[in-house]
């Protein structure tokens, strides 16, 4: 049934929002199966999670969209466009883009876990976008399910009536039909704006090696026809719509996309930067006056250097990053050089999970071996001459004498945990310079703790540590609140007096000594012994605050002296000592890749 002839009031655009592991992708699979979009023998777990990485980690990284046809109880045929969204804190911008393309949202909560931090964060995004929210309790068939307790949490959270909550088990296929009925009856149909000038919202784009950029969009106003000349608001470029259509499991070409529908557009976009996610598409000849609202250029929060292990692979790394950046509007990168690592790129990421995923995708999909430097945030530095600069690389931090003050980004964080672990979470937060704000009790067992943190303290391994101090129960979500002044210092690592720029970090003065000591000890275990002594020093400016020494490998030069005069032995030892001294002057210490990663897991 071609979507071109469909009545707008038979279309339902909705998405699924949930915390990680609450069964969102499995629920999407079940909906596809029940509506006949997928036959049972075509099923792979998590159909919409295309990347192996998504299936392996059990997370959704990209936004996906798929069209389903469903005959409701009233005998009418409906078109359901499901837009699957990521659930992790790093991808909240992807979530907001997908939400803007919908009219309704299924809020999925695990019956065994209850409401978690990410559930609340995504719920706020959905409420801001003005979506109709259908609460769904999933995994009701598990023995440990507490359906009534979780229902009460949802009622307290969004104020719905108990009978409005749909109970399902995505795995067992229970309650899916009643969920589809709820989508049809409760999610509003799109507004009928077919007569207005074309405005379409890009919520995702992927790169096809043969066709260029494939743009996924929601038609908000007007009609898009095959062969139309279209204009992108962000860069004012004009393209011809070579192919348009809707998305089933595969792309289904069509000749018309009307207001209210979701589809794709292929128009020979060669440069990946031209298809900006969040941009508005209009017709070149009958243009809309204003772009669609609510879109911002996404700002990276965490920065890290990516360098090829083999310097010959620099161009491969550049190409791979270019292709990745089309699929991922939030990846930012600029070339940089390092004395220790050669040529590479300074990359900006949304958060730590985003960084890990980009690294894994580079290694898996693009077969590039990379070394990563310590992740850090962007500091705002006021120099003594009154100039303000942004520093995203510790080695670019000016000398201490030239700095009048340093500001770092802060985030507001909410941590939901069992009441038993409040003490552990508080202790961890205080160690990380967190400022406690207040506590909300969700029920008798679970609390929502509010803190303000320097972003630098949580980009490292805070999430892992939080999970371990709460035995896996705590979940967190954060939002950026701005820059604040801090007493920060640049900590350099010197090997035999030579600074290694890739190991520099910016730390709070109160933690500098402890960090320097741990780092030197860690590097001592990783850097292999040389033919000469190697001094590892941590220094703030010219003041060394910690030192470890790797002793030299020594050949036994006295082995062939059987007995004999002591002065002969002394002469041989002195000669060896001179040789080592000369070596030390000309020798360069090879720093293995693990040393750059050591900084990431310094406590282990």
From Swiss-Prot:
Name of the protein: Elongation factor 4
Phylogenetic classification of the source organism: Bacteria, Pseudomonadati, Chlorobiota, Chlorobiia, Chlorobiales
Binding site for GTP: 21-26, 138-141
Membrane topology listed for this record: Peripheral membrane protein
A single GO BP: positive regulation of translation
One GO MF term: translation elongation factor activity
Catalytic activity, reaction form: GTP + H2O = GDP + phosphate + H(+)
Similarity annotation: Belongs to the TRAFAC class translation factor GTPase superfamily. Classic translation factor GTPase family. LepA subfamily.
An annotated GO cellular component: plasma membrane
Keywords for the protein's UniProt record, in alphabetical order: Cell inner membrane, Cell membrane, GTP-binding, Hydrolase, Membrane, Nucleotide-binding, Protein biosynthesis
Protein localization: Cell inner membrane
Function: Required for accurate and efficient protein synthesis under certain stress conditions. May act as a fidelity factor of the translation reaction, by catalyzing a one-codon backward translocation of tRNAs on improperly translocated ribosomes. Back-translocation proceeds from a post-translocation (POST) complex to a pre-translocation (PRE) complex, thus giving elongation factor G a second chance to translocate the tRNAs correctly. Binds to ribosomes in a GTP-dependent manner.
EC number from the UniProt entry: 3.6.5.n1
Stretches assigned to the tr-type G domain: 9-191
Principal EC category: hydrolase
CDD domains per UniProt: EF4_II (cd03699), EF4_III (cd16260), LepA (cd01890), lepA_C (cd03709)
Primary subcellular site in the record, as a coarse category: membrane
PROSITE patterns recorded: G_TR_2 (PS51722)
Entries under HAMAP family matching the protein: LepA
Keyword Cell inner membrane: yes
